[in-house]
Amino acid sequence: VPPSEKVINAEPYNCSLGAPWKKANVTTKMYKNEKKLLYPVNVGRNIARESAITHYILASDIELYPSPDLPARFLEMIRRRDQPALTKPNPKVFVLPIFEVDEKSLPPRNKTALIRMLKTGSAIPFHKKLCSGCHNVPKSKEWLEAAETEGMHVFHVGKRTGPFVHWEPIFIGTNTDPMYDERLSWEGKSDKMTQGYALCVLDYDFLILDNAFLVHRPGIKVFKKDPRREVLTAKTNILIKKIIVPELKVMYGTRKGCAV
């Protein structure tokens, strides 16, 4: 990737033309795509985590919008520390359920609005049409039936086992949690699965928050056949099975019910 100084100094730019990224064709004109590079999503996640100056970290994706006032409400819950789940000795992370909204809708500002959108069909659970099991949250039906309340609380403590053995949650954690494997790319998929296995073996509790959630940038995701990505996915699956999983077993051991 060329240094930013080289790009800036390459030629004069007429600022009256507006921002160049507004006219960019992100499908074909991105440097990554022109050079057939893979998107190193886990490198980005780890850099973001290690660069954070706070104790708690939300290693989320840039297109996932947190519900408003999440930091203040979360930290107040931590300050109160008045729920049994918060005082258990197990290592823990705080899970945010994820949703999609249609391209004509604005992200909901609270859980009440989210539930209303789910009932009308303008919102759906994340990846429902792509990989519903990957983001199916324990007690999700009960979560949706529970009315919004004041503040923030732990709704349920889940585990990455049983029906949720392939769960890929996004959560608030700390830098004591296992890092993401940087050999995995966005194009190859399964980029959070190996970390999920480590969390399971280490007996992490997944504390699902009641009035907090993430919403993907508007637009419902639908399946699109991508032959190049299918090839990369197959290679990634082999890498995980033959190389990464044996390494994880040496590093963290095994636990009944845990799988990548």
Which ranges hold each PLM region?
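Catalytic metal- and UDP-sugar-binding loop of GT-A-like glycosyltransferases, i.e.
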Residues: 60
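Acidic donor-binding segment of Leloir-type glycosyltransferases
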Residues: 1-30
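Catalytic donor-sugar/metal-binding loop of nucleotide-sugar-dependent glycosyltransferases
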Residues: 200-214
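Conserved catalytic core of nucleotide-sugar-dependent glycosyltransferases
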Residues: 22-37, 45, 49-50, 64-188, ...
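Short active-site alpha-helical segment characteristic of glycosyltransferases
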Residues: 195, 199
